[in-house]
Structures are given as structure tokens and as C-alpha cells.
């Protein structure tokens, strides 16, 4: 078999997930893996590009850099862009779109940068074939990414298209659902690999539950997506992609159970729809119940000890909740964890630092993550088994 050429790539992610993403890439077989700002750079071949899009749980998109240069102004930017051999990546009939990210005192207007990039590409093709390619913001054949830091410009091709957090299984939603990429990253940070039961007592539309099931069974998160941008590239290898997409040899059995509950019946309905769309119904049980009403025991169930991993993304109080409501809610969370989940481990994310103190448990680990634009604490709590009320029974599910 002919060995494929290798090239540089960049996987974008959320702040705080860089190390998790780097480990994912190493596991996939990537070389020259290096942490960047909200990204990880690496090197690999076309097969790795396809696998990265399909298999990475904590990547938002995979970029392939094609040019890097310095530009002091928009004229210099235009001239450098004209020098790129665009015919290697597109034709004059190719529709394209531009995504520009600018951190620069020189280039303050990202929209004007986008116009200059468009002009440079259009003028390249006018000179070459007397034909201008069309810009299309909806389903373009080629998505071009421009990153400018001060005067350093990097031009990349976006191999993903829609953000990779859009797995394809979310058919229903609730208010402010957590990103699939962030949920998967948090699960991996918590050490989840399907080794125990897992419980999300505020499951919303089921993101933690589904991502946990996919990790437990080692199902690639991208199998539900209908399309990737690289499928429209001139050098797309349909046979290679088909082999990678249809390879389920790394999937595994999952012998434990994933539980989700929520105070809202509507949320449980929405979660059930998403779980069905992801095809993981047999791994997940749902129940409508308030946090403070939950009963859980570490007694043997079906001959197995239940030492659950508990994942919680409670309300942060950003939407009209009073401080008293938040304090009471987080206090109830702490009480339930302490009395119902002794012997288990809980991880909680929240941007409400004051409310987090009301949990009343000392975190054994603390991380900082971004949930959207909100700076959040992501804390681990070891729920040590101590004296418990003998009346506690496993009645939660």
C-alpha cells in the first residue's frame, strides 16, 4: 500500500480542554502533538484527517493550514493571498465561504478582512480563467479559515464544515443545553470510560447521558453526522472514508447502567428523543424526580456494587433566579450527594462561585472551563462512605 503524505493540522476546542484533546489525538496516532491556545496542532495523513473528524470527542473543527505569512496592512494581506496556488484546492466553479478570526491592532475590522480575502481569491481566478468563483455562506464547497494574530496570518481549509459539536443526534432541546464537546471533555476529565454506573440528576435534554454512552461503548461521535466539508475537496478519497466510517472494530460492550433524571417532565421527554436518535436507549434509564427527592444506595444491585460517577450541570442563576433560590438549590445538591451517594464521585460545573460554596463539600480537584462565555468552576467531590440512615434504599429507579 502506498504510504500517504503527512501534513500539519489544527484541532480547535474550548478553553480548558486542550490536554484532553491532545490525549485523544495521541490515541488516534497523531504525531507532533502540541498544545495551542484553545487548540492542538498535530501532524498526520489523510486517513488521520478523516478519523479526527469522525472520532474526536473534544474537537470543534479540524483545520488544515495551507499558508502562513506576515502582513502589515490589508494590501499586503491581499498580495500574499494572491500568491497562494488556489487551483490546488478549488476550481473557478467552486463556491466558497470565509471565516475570519482577528486579534490585531492592525486589522481591527474582521469584515473588511473577509472582503479582501474574497477579492484576492476572485482576482486570482479572473487572471487565470477569466471567471470569478461565487461566495456562498450556505453549504459552500470550500470553507476557508483566516486567523490573524497581530501581523501573523494563517490561512487554513476547514475540513469539518459545521462545528463538530453538532453530532447529529440532537433532535430535541431544552433551555441552554450544554455543548456536546464540553460534556464529552468533562466526562473524559472525570476519567469516565464505562467502568461504573453514571448518574446525571439534572439531565436536561440528555447530553451527558448520551456522550457517556458513546464513550462507554467507544462509538465514534461523528457517525450521526450527514456530511463533512472534506467530502467536497478535490482530493477526497471516497473508498478510504468509507472504510474508516464503517469500521466499528473498536466498539466495546458496556455492562453498567447510565441513569438520568430531571424535575421537568418536558426535559425527560426531550432527553428520551435524543437518546433514541443516538441509538443508546438500552444503556440509559430516565426518571422524572426532583434532586432533593432522590434516593440512591451503594448496596449491591444485581450482584454488582453501585459506585456511580455523578455528573451535574445545575442552573447557574443567570436567568432571573434569586441568590436565595440558588443557595437553597446548591445546598440541596450537597445534601443529596452526601447522604445518597456515599462511596461515589461527583463532578459539578457552575459559573456561580457563591452558590458552589453552599454545596458544603470540599472539592478534591478544581478546574476552570468555559461554558459558552461563562467562566466556570469544574469541581470533583469524593463522597466518602460514612454513617448513613439505614432507611436509605435504592428507590431512585
Residue ranges of predicted features:
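C-terminal catalytic and target-recognition region of SAM-dependent MTase-like enzymes
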Residues: 289-397
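Non-catalytic nucleic-acid substrate-recognition regions in nucleic-acid-modifying enzymes
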Residues: 2-140, 396-397
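A short, flexible beta-alpha/helix-coil linker loop
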Residues: 103-106, 163, 315-319
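C-terminal edge-of-domain segments
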Residues: 144-160, 379
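Flexible, glycine-/basic-rich loop-and-beta segments that form/coincide
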Residues: 51, 56, 162-167, 171-172, ...
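Conserved S-adenosyl-L-methionine
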Residues: 178-296, 325
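SAM-dependent Rossmann-like transferase core, predominantly class I methyltransferases
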Residues: 155-189
